[in-house]
Structure formats: C-alpha cells, structure tokens
Amino acid sequence: EEGGSPPPVVI
C-alpha cells in the first residue's frame, strides 16, 4: 500500500 493524496483505494 502506498500513501498519497487522495489515499489509495482498496478494492
């Protein structure tokens, strides 16, 4: 998982 903006969407 990577942090970001917007945050990653977990499917």
Curated annotation (Swiss-Prot):
Please state where this protein is localized.
Secreted
Keywords from UniProt, A to Z, are:
Hypotensive agent, Metalloenzyme inhibitor, Metalloprotease inhibitor, Protease inhibitor, Secreted
Q: In which tissues is it expressed?
A: Expressed by the venom gland.
> What does UniProt give as GO cellular component?
extracellular region
Q: Which GO terms describe its biological process?
A: regulation of blood pressure
Kindly list the cysteine pairs connected by disulfide bridges.
Answer: none
An example molecular function term from Gene Ontology annotations: peptidase inhibitor activity
Indicate yes or no for the key word Secreted.
yes
Q: Which family does it belong to?
A: Belongs to the bradykinin-potentiating peptide family.
Described by its record, this protein's role is as follows:
This peptide both inhibits the activity of the angiotensin-converting enzyme (ACE) and enhances the action of bradykinin by inhibiting the peptidases that inactivate it. It acts as an indirect hypotensive agent.
This protein's name: Bradykinin-potentiating peptide 5
